Design a protein with these regions (language model features):
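Hydrophobic ligand-binding cavity/cleft-lining segments
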Residues: 1-43, 143, 153, 158-164
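Hydrophobic/aromatic beta-strand elements that line small-molecule binding cavities or substrate pockets
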Residues: 5-7, 36, 61-66, 86-93, ...
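Beta-strand elements of well-folded, non-transmembrane domains
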Residues: 9-13, 52-56, 67-69, 81-83, ...
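A short, structured loop/turn motif at beta-sheet edges
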Residues: 13, 40-44, 66-70, 90-100
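Hydrophobic pocket/interface hotspot
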Residues: 16-20, 26, 48, 101-103, ...
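Glycine-rich portal/gate segments that line the openings of hydrophobic small-molecule binding cavities
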Residues: 37-79, 132, 136, 162
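Beta-strand/loop substructures that line and gate deep hydrophobic ligand-binding cavities in soluble
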Residues: 76-128, 164
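A conserved amphipathic terminal alpha-helix motif
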Residues: 109-164
């Protein structure tokens, strides 16, 4: 499965990057996230474990994510029920208080049974993830360095929900 989503957001790239990197906060605004913990974090990498629970399906995913704040974070699977799982977040500053977010993910479950059980659930999660961060940005505190100008966020058309 290939997923590509993008959105224009009335927040700085730094602010959006910080929301994306803060996996420990995901349970507060992602209804499918039953738990999350940061395993390690430094200037170049963040590693996290996320428990996904949605419509009776529950599994854990551990990723190690190389990053370049505020414009890029890779998503690299360390552990989880996937044969393939790789993705990225790209953030492009458009103005001091606006940016473009791009999310891409390619994944394939490691077993046909898991694909049937969790595939549609995970499809829904990945296809609504960018929108969830846009909503979160509208309710989160703007960092002191960023202007407090509010602009409505706009989701742009998704370019993919292609099955491989």
């Amino acid at each position: 499965m290939n997923v590509r989503k993008s959105a224009l957001v009335g927040r700085s790239a730094e602010h959006m990057f910080d929301l994306i990197e803060a996996a420990e906060d995901y349970p507060a605004f992602l209804p499918w996230c039953a738990g999350a913990s940061i395993l390690s974090r430094d200037e170049n990498t963040v590693a996290a474990e996320i428990t996904i629970e949605f419509h009776g399906v529950r599994f854990q995913v551990t990723t190690r994510n190389p990053k370049r704040r505020p414009e890029y974070m890779a998503i690299v699977l360390e552990r989880g029920p996937f044969r393939r799982f790789e993705g990225e977040w790209r953030l492009t500053p458009l103005a001091p208080d606006a940016c473009k977010i791009e999310f891409g993910l390619q994944y394939e479950f490691d077993s046909p049974l898991m694909g049937r059980l969790a595939g549609s659930v995970f499809d829904r999660i990945t296809n609504t993830l960018v929108d969830a961060f846009v909503v979160r940005a509208g309710t989160s505190t703007v960092p002191a360095a960023a202007p407090a100008t509010e602009q409505p966020s706009q989701s742009t058309g998704a370019t993919g929900n292609e099955h491989n």
